[in-house]
Amino acid sequence: MKQLSLLALLGIAVSSAAVAHHSRAAFKLDKTVQFVGTLTEVTWANPHLFFKAMVDNDKGGQDEWSFEGGNISSAVRGGWQKEDVRAGDHVVIEGYANLNPKIKYALLERVTLTATGASYPRRDMTREVKVEPSKDFSGTWVLTGRDNRTGEHFSAPKDLTQLTALGKAQIDAFDTVNDPYFRCIMISTPRVIFGAAGYRFTRDAKTLRIDKEQSNRHRVIHMDGAPMPANFKPDMDGWSVGRVEKDGTLIIETSGFEPTPWGVARGVDSSAQKRSIERYKLDPDGLGISASYTITDPVYLTAPYTVVGRYKKVADYEFPAEPPCDPEVASRHLRNGK
């Protein structure tokens, strides 16, 4: 373990991966390092918490480090409140150092206050609570199989080849730094169904409501087949109508989209002609969902484009009220936390 201070001799090797919105390919995820010092900045904002600290080095001096935390909802589930950790606190931070030793920008896993011993993980890793199965898709779900250590989730999709000349030109010009999310332009439907954080499905007689954690996003699916109103204003979520087939598959059809940056896929925009069909099939045990979406858009696609994924059921929890996305924070990782 790299020695950054005297307390680094007590460093703990950790095999768990850090998974959040941005790629973790820049960090050494095979073990944690301990950083000891005084916080100079605590930014409680979305999509990520950020910290700066003057960290003790092995030469008897200090270096300024930046640390990227998780999102607010994960921190709250881990036991944090905004006022718990402040600038001026002396702390021990467990985190993943940068692969480039010259870059003083690390991924925070846990921060401990030396004055009180209070410890705050980036996310709650220890809760063991009973998970109740779902009978009708209701409940709280998270995406499975998402591991952004390699950065593959943040590249242009390799399987997207059915592109018009306009779509191909956009893919050829792809650069991840142009991701609209880094400017707080949210991920549109249906791409958003395979994003990070949790989803809560709530059923009533006429609608299915899908709440998206972290983004304050609330979709309403009209299960009664209600037609799109004449005065409906197109947006990134569109107008959705749903039904449950005889085999139990939930079908959601959506139109009424506005033109959206990267609305088809990473690197490919969408037009007002975009249409989508989502399919959800509940596992027999009620603890998993097989999901997919198919997009058509004649402006950018020559044929339908389908993406598949999986959800797992988790114990229900409250989605905390969160501040809106901060563009300065959303792009801060591009500047190594500066």
Region roles according to the model:
Residues S5-S16:
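Bacterial N-terminal signal peptides
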Residues G11-I12, A20, S73, G78:
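Preference for short coil/turn "hinge" residues that link or interrupt alpha-helices
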Residues A17-A25:
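Boundary at the C-terminal end of the N-terminal hydrophobic targeting segment
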Residues A25-K338:
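PEST-like low-complexity, intrinsically disordered acidic/proline/serine-rich tracts
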